[in-house]
Every structure is written in structure tokens, then in C-alpha cells.
């Protein structure tokens, strides 16, 4: 079940607010300019989905995002617990960073934890199947896929070159709860 936990950026041990209600999550995130919606990810993708099959299954949703926001490219990230690069990729995404463009993800299976750092707060968003999350450009954030990642998400970009991160150099992510 999707969830949102809000912390002070000075007190990672004490949540200020928490909910698993999609409407409440959407209200909180809309207030900070972040788009959160529940879409339908109802295509059967199989055990190890191929990117082309995922894109074909959800082309209508991709086209909708492109029409609304003028995005230029998209791809699929799919991680499984047996991926030999899972630890290195987890560490890469766990460092706080920003992008010069929106970070848009549509989870078509599994889950992951997006953590946003703004307005002296940390917003931990547990994204699950059916969740669309769009984080505006330049918001510091990190992503935790867990120690045994199991998710597939469509990533949509402004930049045809895809995912380009700029590290903030802040180690704030080290103090906050992570996925198991």
C-alpha cells in the first residue's frame, strides 16, 4: 500500500505526519508541487519483463504524459533481487541528488521509496504498483529500492539523454529509515 511519511529534516526518528490514504498523500504532495496519482497498471508482464513489452503495454499512458508536458524520451527500469548490480545501484540512488528536469516514474509493478528534501522536511513516499510520481526539477531527493529490489517502473524525461543526476553532497539520506 502506498504511503507518505513526513519528517523534520532535523529529526529522522520522529515522523510529523503519516498516511496510506491516496487522497491524503496527493493533497500533501500537491501542496509542495509534486504530482502523485493512482493509475491502472493492469497488464500482465511476466516474471522478467522486457522493456519493449512494458513500453508497448503502457504506450497510452506514456503518450498522455508526453502530450501534457512535452517529455522527449522514456525508458524502463526493472530490478529483481537477483540482479548482480543491485547493491551498487542502490548506493548510487541513495545519495541525495537533483535533476535539471522533472523526475517522472510510473510504477507498473513492485515498490520503491522516494525521499524528497525541501522546506526543512523530508517526505518519504512509498510508491507501489499503480503509482505515478512526478518530482519537479531541482528538488533534492534520493531513492531506496531496498536490499532485495523487486519493481518495474517507466521513467519519462525532458532530456533525450535520460537520467542525469547532480549530487548535492549532503549525507542526509544516511539518517532516515530505509526499505528492508
Curated annotation (Swiss-Prot):
CDD domains: cupin_ARD
Family: Belongs to the acireductone dioxygenase (ARD) family.
Function noted in UniProt: Catalyzes 2 different reactions between oxygen and the acireductone 1,2-dihydroxy-3-keto-5-methylthiopentene (DHK-MTPene) depending upon the metal bound in the active site. Fe-containing acireductone dioxygenase (Fe-ARD) produces formate and 2-keto-4-methylthiobutyrate (KMTB), the alpha-ketoacid precursor of methionine in the methionine recycle pathway. Ni-containing acireductone dioxygenase (Ni-ARD) produces methylthiopropionate, carbon monoxide and formate, and does not lie on the methionine recycle pathway.
Positions of the record's site feature: May play a role in metal incorporation in vivo: 96
Keywords: Amino-acid biosynthesis, Dioxygenase, Iron, Metal-binding, Methionine biosynthesis, Nickel, Oxidoreductase
PANTHER family: ACIREDUCTONE DIOXYGENASE (PTHR23418:SF0)
InterPro entries per UniProt: ARD, ARD_bac, RmlC-like_jellyroll, RmlC_Cupin_sf
Cofactor annotation comment: Binds 1 Fe(2+) cation per monomer. Binds 1 nickel ion per monomer.
Protein's recorded name: Acireductone dioxygenase
Gene that this sequence comes from: mtnD
Binding site for Fe(2+): 97, 99, 103, 141
UniProt-annotated binding residues for Ni(2+): 97, 99, 103, 141
GO molecular function: acireductone dioxygenase (Ni2+-requiring) activity; acireductone dioxygenase [iron(II)-requiring] activity; iron ion binding; nickel cation binding
Enzyme class, first EC level, given as a word: oxidoreductase
Site (Important to generate the dianion): 105
Pathway: Amino-acid biosynthesis; L-methionine biosynthesis via salvage pathway; L-methionine from S-methyl-5-thio-alpha-D-ribose 1-phosphate: step 5/6
GO BP of this protein: L-methionine salvage from methylthioadenosine; L-methionine salvage from S-adenosylmethionine
Domain of life: Bacteria
Amino acid at each position: 500500500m502506498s504511503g507518505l511519511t513526513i519528517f523534520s529534516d532535523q529529526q529522522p526518528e520522529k515522523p510529523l505526519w503519516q498516511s496510506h490514504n491516496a487522497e491524503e498523500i496527493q493533497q500533501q504532495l500537491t501542496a509542495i508541487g509534486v504530482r502523485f496519482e493512482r493509475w491502472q497498471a493492469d497488464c500482465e508482464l511476466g516474471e522478467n519483463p522486457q522493456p519493449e513489452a512494458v513500453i508497448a503495454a503502457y504506450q497510452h499512458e506514456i503518450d498522455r504524459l508526453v502530450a501534457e508536458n512535452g517529455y522527449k524520451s522514456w525508458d524502463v527500469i526493472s530490478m529483481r533481487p537477483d540482479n548482480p548490480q543491485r547493491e551498487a545501484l542502490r548506493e548510487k540512488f541513495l545519495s541525495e541528488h537533483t535533476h535539471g528536469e522533472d523526475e517522472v516514474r510510473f510504477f507498473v509493478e513492485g515498490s520503491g521509496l522516494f525521499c524528497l528534501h525541501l522546506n526543512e522536511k523530508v517526505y518519504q513516499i512509498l510508491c507501489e504498483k499503480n503509482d505515478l510520481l512526478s518530482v519537479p526539477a531541482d528538488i533534492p531527493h534520493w531513492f531506496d529500492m531496498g536490499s532485495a529490489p523487486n519493481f518495474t517502473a517507466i521513467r519519462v524525461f525532458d532530456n533525450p539523454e535520460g537520467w542525469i543526476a547532480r549530487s548535492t553532497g549532503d549525507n542526509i539520506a544516511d539518517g532516515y529509515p530505509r526499505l528492508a
